[in-house]
Regions:
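Short, glycine-rich nucleotide/cofactor-binding loops
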Residues: 4-14, 222-232
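Active-site and donor-binding regions of nucleotide-sugar-utilizing enzymes
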Residues: 5-171
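A conditional alpha-helix N-cap/helix-loop micro-motif detector
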Residues: 74-77, 81-84, 192, 196, ...
Length: 249
């Protein structure tokens, strides 16, 4: 049986992982990893385990580890070496297993460490990305400064890089994807389908707790750095039309 591991940093990615398990990966063994980049992730993983959705579920203190690394030059050097050799990573249980495919979206350094370790277990591992909203359809491949050190050294050692192993891009609207990966359509979530039923058990879906009539789902660019896309001005205009008291962001 094919074994997949899906790394999730946001709730949107987690919902995609659930839908993938219920559709394209229905007859495959799927491990899901949910990180502390999202609040309450540890509790959600406990609930997911109780619902028996995936073969394995793990909580990963990824964000916490990243913050610790920023203050520890020795740890940074150690993990840089791990990106090159694939040895001695974070010590998570999922890092020591064999997988046929790794699916992710956020290309953080810690993801590259996990990739390097999984590659050692299976040099034929397939790497895929999945979408994080429409903006992600136009995502280019970002090469960090460390990649200019890591990638050539991996090639000298006869090891492929993360980008060289990439194949698929899982998304809801493949016709909109213009990147270099192979677009694979995730079936849309049906209102009365299995994924919707799971989500209603995982989360409180009652609308009674929200007095606002409209919800604005923002991206990260305007409030977490990167290139602003002007969302703040858009929100102001929407609020002027519908009223501040009717809008939750």
């Amino acid at each position: 049986m094919k074994k997949d591991i899906i790394i999730c940093n946001t709730y949107f990615q987690l919902i995609e992982a659930i839908q993938l398990k219920n559709t394209l990966f229905l007859h495959e063994s799927v491990t899901v990893v949910f990180s502390d980049h999202s609040r309450n992730a540890e509790n959600i993983i406990k609930q997911i385990k109780s619902l028996d959705i995936f073969e394995q579920c793990f909580f990963w203190s990824s964000f916490k580890k990243m913050k610790e690394q920023e203050k520890n030059s020795h740890e940074n050097r150690r993990l840089l070496l791990c990106e090159i050799t694939g040895k001695d990573g974070y010590g998570n249980p999922f890092e020591s297993e064999f997988y046929d495919e790794l699916i992710y979206y956020n290309q953080f350094d810690n993801l590259k460490v996990v990739f390097a370790e999984l590659y050692e277990k299976n040099p034929q591992i397939k790497i895929s990305r999945f979408e994080e909203g429409i903006f992600s359809y136009a995502d280019g491949e970002y090469l960090a400064k460390k990649d200019k050190i890591v990638n050539p050294l991996r090639k000298i050692l006869g090891k492929k890089t993360l980008l060289e192993c990439q194949q698929n891009f899982y998304c809801f609207y493949p016709e909109l994807y213009k990147g270099h990966l192979n677009p694979m359509q995730i079936p849309k979530i049906e209102a009365d389908g299995k994924t919707a039923q799971i989500l209603s058990r995982l989360f409180d879906t009652s609308t009674a707790v929200y007095p606002q009539k409209y919800v604005f789902f923002s991206s990260v660019f305007d409030f977490e750095g990167g290139a602003p896309v002007g969302e703040l001005e858009v929100i102001k205009k929407v609020a002027a039309l519908v009223g501040n008291e009717n809008l939750i962001v």
